[in-house]
């Protein structure tokens, strides 16, 4: 069994992807090669990829797409790319054309989960509770049917990139301008308060298994990029201090959403708990694997060690 790990990418989450790849390479129980997509879209292979990993940045690559790889050498490809042009079905589509098994969700599920607006529409139709939201496209006047505070987010980014908390309607225009730097579509979501943020991991194909539920606590106004990836900025409680009934409901809703959206392999499913009501926030089909990432820590708390988790993900790609 030989694995090709693809990391980096052209999205704003380039550095996070490299941090995740470092952890995976350290723990994966199979011979694994690394390919890095630089921020200019070109690829780095071999020692140059490892050098980029060590530097946690690859502004310029060497090989244009498609890279000169001997794809037949690899049994499974592990795309560890966060954000657009990696987590949104694009790389998955390329691997489908190659006929290579790969870790994680397929083309349609990846694209659907990446789009916060479309995924909420599907989940709401299926009876999964979601926070009130409205989509706004670049160039159209925003019509927000609820009062502030609310969050403005690019529809197709992760890691809290481009997100603003808006307290007054007069600040909406600036928040949308920031979101439109990253996407042509934004979502405006009602802010819940007081709120607890819960996360659960799912592992499996169609009928997944859920990890214990974790909780994220922090002092920042919201769970932004710096809070997520700076050690000590957030407290991760695993398991979350919840009554058994609430924990079971979180797990059941996560598994339902996983099936409804057609996800396979893995996902981290994020929830809000406000005034006793649960709301599904989003599914991340390529969750972080950094030292502070919740997904591997949740499964470790459930008795699945990091190397075993990676082994199962690779094996799921072949089934």
Curated annotation (Swiss-Prot):
PROSITE patterns recorded: ATP_GRASP, DALA_DALA_LIGASE_1, DALA_DALA_LIGASE_2
The protein's required cofactors: Mg(2+); Mn(2+)
GO cellular component: cytosol
Record Gene3D superfamilies: 3.40.50.20, ATP-grasp fold, A domain (3.30.1490.20), ATP-grasp fold, B domain (3.30.470.20)
Binding-site residues, ATP: 147-198
SUPFAM superfamilies tied to this protein: Glutathione synthetase ATP-binding domain-like (SSF56059), PreATP-grasp domain (SSF52440)
EC class name: ligase
Keywords of this entry: ATP-binding, Cell shape, Cell wall biogenesis/degradation, Cytoplasm, Ligase, Magnesium, Manganese, Metal-binding, Nucleotide-binding, Peptidoglycan synthesis
ATP-grasp domain segment(s): 120-315
Positions with a binding annotation for Mg(2+) 1: 270, 282
GO molecular function, one term: D-alanine-D-alanine ligase activity
Protein name, per record: D-alanine--D-alanine ligase
Protein's organism: Thermus thermophilus (strain ATCC 27634 / DSM 579 / HB8)
